[in-house]
Amino acid sequence: MHSQMSGLPPSPPVGTKEDPAKAVDGLLSLTEFQVVGAAKAMPADKYSFAPAQGIFAASQTTQFDTVRTFVAQVTHVAQANYFFFGWSGIQPDRDVKAIGSITTKDEAVAALEASFVYAHKAIATITPENAFVAIKPIDGFSTRTTIAAFAAAHGYDHYGQMVEYLRMNGIVPPASAK
């Protein structure tokens, strides 16, 4: 577990009142460390990989026609970061919709990394005064802090799927290799 947590900064002393932006940013940084690491670990020629019936036993019948490719997992997280942190009012530095059309590893990783830069900028606008003030809800969450925490959780959901894709291709995820 320690190797998977190595993306976090050191914890403050017990009893210290922590700045909400710093606390949430640490959570997002850990998600970023894992997701970007997985995205970089998958070889470029495997970015079009998606699980299909042929890799499972005949008795394990499932519909795979809507399963995302690896590149779609990466670009989905990138687009979601822009969506979740749009409350900040910070204008994205790219066409967010176009991210969904990316098909190459280099472009997907660049978009993913840029989306985390955007997310960190948004989190930096969270203050003790506005952290838990209700704003326009996103997926049922209505404060800057809860939306930011949900964004990190969402990234972890897709990280778990990306790990499965890596393992199906014989690749040990970077966090597990340490």
Model segments located where?
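Short, helix-capping/interhelical loops that line the mouth of catalytic, cofactor-
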Residues: 2-26, 74-138, 169-178
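Short, contiguous alpha-helical
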Residues: 25, 33-36, 49-97, 136-178
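N-terminal targeting signals for Sec/Tat export/insertion, comprising classic cleavable signal peptides
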Residues: 14-49
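Hydrophobic residues within well-ordered, non-membrane alpha-helices that form the packing/core
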Residues: 39, 122-123, 162
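Catalytic His-Asp segment of secreted/periplasmic serine-dependent ester chemistry enzymes
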Residues: 44, 125, 141
